[in-house]
Amino acid sequence: MTMHRFGQTRGARRCDHLLQTPDTFVRAPLPGMKGATAIVHAAPAIGAKFTQYTAEFEAGGTLGSTEAQRFVYVLEGQLEIDGDLLESGGYVWLPPAAPALIRAAIRSRAAVIEKPYVALAGIPCPTMFRGTETALTPTPLFSDPDVQVRSLIPSDPAFDLAVNTMTFQPGASLPMVEIHVMEHGLSMLQGNGIYRLGDHWYPVEAGDFIWMAPYLPQWFGALGKKPARYLIFKDWNRLP
């Protein structure tokens, strides 16, 4: 292992946000994992109402079961979900306690989000579904063609979460500082930029993770020569 340079890191922890950078990652298997390890990013221990981690699989590795709903997005490699193959950019949503087997066909990495499902009276819980990010038509954010959003979860009140990818052309930014009741888990997939979190401004790049608590002032602007892109979770469709 290479020794760290005098304890310096871009990573930071505040009461209402976390920037976790790859140099700070600690890997450990979670219960039920076989041939796989996890980098836990957000969890109830930090105050989050969901858990998000990166799962790193050897060929044949599997995830354990969970009583929560689960969203899996393939970052690299190939995952088999009950025999169906998901490649990079593919994803699956699983209802609570779903028995589906998630297995790596080759060495793979995936973003995993787990959250207790909050039901709505009279509306049944959705069934498992799969998708591919590139098959979705992007939508400009507030009519800005330089910021494109793909919604990976259907617009259906049965779902209590939203997961999107957002792509920013170099120099593009969010049009406002957002302050809202939803919390976020965000994985930087590509590029770099500046993220405002509260009264702190952080350089961020591909591989970073950000947790944002409710009502945290937040803003992002893309820098560099290529588009910046991230995967972002929020709680949705339920009373606070």
Range-by-range predicted roles:
Residues 67-82, 181-198:
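Glycine- and acidic-residue-biased ligand/ion/polar-headgroup-sensing regions
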Residues 78, 99, 109, 185, ...:
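Structural motif
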Residues 82-99, 198-214:
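Short acidic-glycine-tyrosine-enriched beta hairpin
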Residues 53-55, 163-166, 176-177, 184, ...:
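A structural feature that tracks compact, well-ordered secondary-structure segments
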Residues 102-106, 220-223:
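Asparagine-centered strand-capping/turn motif at beta-strand->loop junctions
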Residues 106-122, 160, 165, 211, ...:
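A short hydrophobic beta-strand segment most commonly corresponding to one strand
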Residues 1-49, 107-160:
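A short, N-terminal "cap"/entry segment at the start of jelly-roll beta-barrel domains
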Residues 35-40, 49-67, 151-152, 164-180, ...:
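Conserved short histidine dyad/triad with adjacent acidic residue
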